């Protein structure tokens, strides 16, 4: 297994050209820029540069006042064109364009993850997903039908958005009405009974008003998986008043409904590193892998969710250089599911005979019935001005936010065991029934922030920002008394069995100060070097609204604990080459995370744990020629425990679910006016798995390559077709693995998607 921890030499050669290009971009970029220089006697011809559809030049968030090329952070912007060309219908698929980012973790033991369970630079980032700069709560899959672009910011984002994951954030930008009329529609069919349709209508009404309607419907089975299905529908109407004037009002609504059959994964038997959990089950060592099509759930398994979001944004241009914006949003995400997973320890195996085909494993029912709500009002002011010879790009604002979550208690669901090699899903345990043992969390936040980029000279910039958050979190939780197993409590005298009894009722208030500072120097008009330092904090209850009583226990949500703190240093360079159509970036980074909860020798818990993630990242986005577009990147990252208990299965100090090497590249070429071809590849390196005492489960997942391709054909100005092929070489790989290592999600096999796009 030792070899799995390193980047395979035979695969490294595939990256040689790309890595060499980006690691040495400074001299290369200078040479490219020099090609455009002229002598004093030459005739100078100025041509307008057409922006690349693969490299948006500006973040849509007004908190980022500088272009992406002059932002002292590692930032990847995935444009709508990239999403369309790749046929990426959800956020997780779109994020495959960012190296080292993905849904690699399948959950805790019998508790499976759902939705966009994203890991980035060694940390769970699923609680740091935003829509238009506003937190989006819920463990659901987010469709891209109403998305203009996806912005991925690596490193602490506490200064930008408040409490957040220590290693990055993801911001989905919604489509808005625009000052032109047109219709775009698409219809898709593909493998595994994939059917999808979208409609995007924008209509101008008068000189300054426009309406826009986006609609989506999709039904599909999961390729390579029996019984797993997904069905979702969405509608997003919006209207804009005052387009092209100094006063603009935008009204938006989003509704998405999903009815899915969740996937609890399959046993890891037969994977590299697996061994039977006991001598009595040694036959599993040579019984072979299970069929990856196997479904270990029941016919009653489901995952239903409903998202409703209403937004009002008003913008006023005070003058040509100053704009004030006010945004009010209400959003609710309701989700309930019954998901069955398997538990594969020695005590969970039943052996009727010596034939492994008769053996069974225990099933466990994962349940959730939750409602998340957010109400926020945010005011932002942006302005550009001079104080003497120093230029300023200022973004400042205030935010008022209330977030609430109710987890409805449900009665336990008991499930029979399942055959390891021949599972039967024809079981109907019924739906969920609430028992009143609810958990309620609420966080109120008032925040004020200010950012400024100072143009000291033509070539030298300084930037800084600070954000102050005052927060108050309340949490109460009840348990149905008289139960059994972990967390069970005895019923008080006179209280009937199954009655809800309050076990936690507590609150936490505090202030957070997050800040960032950076400097940038332009080596040439097209290239720069920069440094940046940022601090971000996550208070107890900050990621799930749950608090734990002070004084005992290992929960990071204890009210007597301090916020988790992350400090990130970054030094990098960015170059716009080929007439500024292509952006090349490279950066070295280090993130130190402190105040992790660790156990003391006497059995109590304290906050002395420290983690570190460090490495480098290189990226490319834009046009090599007017007909050739690319987006991609490579990262090497080392994530370790610096102080505290090792959490990897192999006993090393490595952080789990973090590939040491990751690469992604997508390229599209317009061969003729009517024919386009595209191809891409991505590599996810070997990852450590977490440890929880499970015996015999794999300590690593193996690295893998996946290739995709696309062929496009334009019939006329109103109609074109595109054929996407995913996992072109039908690679067998582990997409995610759970903490115990009993189960994993196999990667999708080779699939096809044919789409007709209509434009009017």
From Swiss-Prot:
Keywords assigned: Cell outer membrane, Ion transport, Iron, Iron transport, Membrane, Receptor, Signal, TonB box, Transmembrane, Transmembrane beta strand, Transport
Induction of expression: Repressed by iron.
Protein name in the entry: Catecholate siderophore receptor Fiu
Signal peptide: 1-31
SUPFAM superfamilies with a match to the protein in the record: Porins (SSF56935)
InterPro entries: Plug_dom, Plug_dom_sf, TonB-dep_rcpt-like, TonB-dep_rcpt_b-brl, TonB_box_CS, TonB_rcpt_b-brl_sf, TonB_sidphr_rcpt
Chain positions of motif TonB C-terminal box: 743-760
Membrane topology: Multi-pass membrane protein
Keyword Membrane: yes
Role noted for this protein: Involved in the active transport across the outer membrane of iron complexed with catecholate siderophores such as dihydroxybenzoylserine and dihydroxybenzoate. It derives its energy for transport by interacting with the trans-periplasmic membrane protein TonB. Can also transport catechol-substituted cephalosporins. Receptor for microcins M, H47 and E492.
Biological process according to GO: intracellular iron ion homeostasis; microcin transport; siderophore transport; siderophore-dependent iron import into cell
PROSITE patterns linked: TONB_DEPENDENT_REC_1, TONB_DEPENDENT_REC_3
First-listed, main subcellular location of the protein, grouped into a coarse class: membrane
GO CC, alphabetical: cell outer membrane; membrane; transmembrane transporter complex
Protein family according to the UniProt entry: Belongs to the TonB-dependent receptor family.
The keyword Ion transport is assigned to this record: yes
């Amino acid at each position: 297994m030792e070899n799995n921890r390193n980047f395979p030499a035979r695969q490294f050669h595939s990256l040689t050209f790309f890595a060499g290009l980006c690691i040495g971009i400074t001299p290369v970029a200078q040479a490219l820029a020099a090609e455009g220089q002229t002598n004093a006697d030459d005739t100078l011809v100025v041509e307008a540069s057409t922006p690349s559809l693969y490299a948006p030049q500006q973040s849509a968030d007004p908190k980022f006042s500088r272009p992406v090329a002059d932002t002292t952070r590692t930032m990847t912007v995935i444009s709508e064109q990239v999403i369309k060309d790749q046929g990426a219908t959800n956020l997780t698929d779109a994020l495959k364009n960012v190296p080292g980012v993905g849904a690699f973790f399948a959950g805790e033991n019998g508790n499976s993850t759902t939705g966009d369970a994203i890991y980035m630079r060694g940390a769970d980032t699923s609680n740091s997903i935003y829509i238009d700069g506003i937190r989006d709560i819920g463990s659901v899959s987010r469709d891209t039908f109403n998305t203009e672009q996806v912005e991925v910011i690596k490193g602490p984002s506490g200064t930008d958005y408040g409490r957040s994951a220590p290693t990055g954030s993801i911001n989905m930008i919604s489509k808005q009405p625009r000052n032109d009329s047109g219709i775009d529609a698409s219809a898709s069919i593909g493998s595994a009974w994939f059917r999808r349709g979208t409609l995007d209508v924008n209509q101008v009404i008068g000189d300054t008003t426009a309406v826009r309607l986006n609609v989506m419907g999709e039904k599909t089975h999961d390729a390579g998986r029996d019984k797993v299905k997904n069905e979702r529908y969405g509608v997003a109407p919006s209207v804009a008043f005052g387009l092209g004037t100094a006063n603009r009002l935008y009204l938006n609504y989003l509704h998405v409904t999903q009815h899915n059959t969740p996937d609890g994964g399959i046993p890891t038997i037969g994977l590299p590193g697996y061994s039977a959990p006991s001598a009595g089950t040694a036959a599993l060592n040579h019984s072979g892998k299970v069929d990856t099509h196997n479904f270990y759930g029941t016919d009653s398994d489901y995952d239903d969710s409903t998202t409703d979001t209403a937004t009002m944004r008003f913008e006023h241009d005070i003058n040509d250089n100053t704009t004030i914006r006010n945004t009010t949003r209400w959003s609710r995400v309701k989700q309930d599911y019954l998901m069955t997973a398997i538990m594969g320890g020695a005590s969970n195996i039943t052996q009727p005979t010596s034939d492994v085909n008769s053996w069974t494993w225990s099933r466990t029912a994962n349940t959730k019935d939750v409602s998340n709500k957010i109400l926020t009002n945010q005011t932002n002011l942006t302005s550009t001005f001079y104080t003497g010879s120093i230029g300023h790009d200022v973004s400042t604002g205030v935010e008022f936010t209330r977030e609430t979550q109710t987890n409805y208690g449900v009665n336990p669901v008991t499930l029979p065991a399942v055959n390891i090699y021949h599972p039967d899903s024809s079981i109907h345990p019924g739906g969920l029934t609430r028992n009143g043992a609810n958990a309620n969390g609420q966080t109120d936040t008032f925040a004020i922030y200010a950012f400024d980029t100072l143009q000291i000279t033509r070539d030298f910039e300084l930037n800084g920002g600070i954000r102050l958050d005052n927060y108050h979190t309340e949490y109460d939780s009840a348990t149905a008394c008289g139960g059994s197993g972990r967390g069970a409590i005895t019923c008080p005298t006179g209280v009937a069995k199954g009655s809800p009894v309050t076990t936690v009722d507590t609150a936490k208030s505090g202030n957070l100060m997050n800040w960032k500072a950076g400097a940038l120097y332009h080596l040439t008009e097209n290239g720069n070097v920069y440094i940046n330092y940022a601090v971000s904090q996550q208070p107890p209850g900050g990621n799930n609204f749950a608090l734990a009583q002070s004084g005992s226990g290992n929960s990071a949500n204890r009210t007597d604990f301090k916020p988790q703190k992350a400090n990130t240093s970054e030094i990098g360079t960015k170059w716009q080459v080929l007439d500024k159509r292509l952006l090349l970036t490279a950066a070295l980074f280090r993130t130190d995370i402190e105040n992790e909860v660790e156990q003391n020798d006497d059995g109590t818990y304290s906050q002395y744990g420290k983690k570190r993630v460090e490495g480098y990242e290189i990226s490319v986005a834009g046009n090599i020629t007017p007909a050739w577009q690319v987006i991609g990147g490579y990262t090497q990252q080392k994530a370790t425990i610096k102080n505290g208990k090792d959490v990897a299965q192999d006993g090393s100090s490595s952080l789990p679910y973090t590939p040491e090497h990751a690469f992604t590249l997508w390229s599209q070429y317009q061969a003729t006016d009517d024919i386009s071809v595209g191809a891409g590849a991505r590599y996810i390196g070997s990852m450590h798995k977490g440890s929880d005492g499970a015996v015999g489960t794999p300590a690593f997942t193996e690295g893998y390559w996946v290739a995709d391709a696309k062929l496009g054909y334009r019939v006329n100005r109103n109609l074109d077709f595109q054929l996407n092929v995913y996992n072109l070489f039908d690679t067998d790989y582990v997409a995610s693995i759970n903490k115990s290592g009993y189960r994993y999600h196999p990667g999708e096999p080779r699939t096809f998607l044919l789409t007709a796009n209509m434009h009017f």
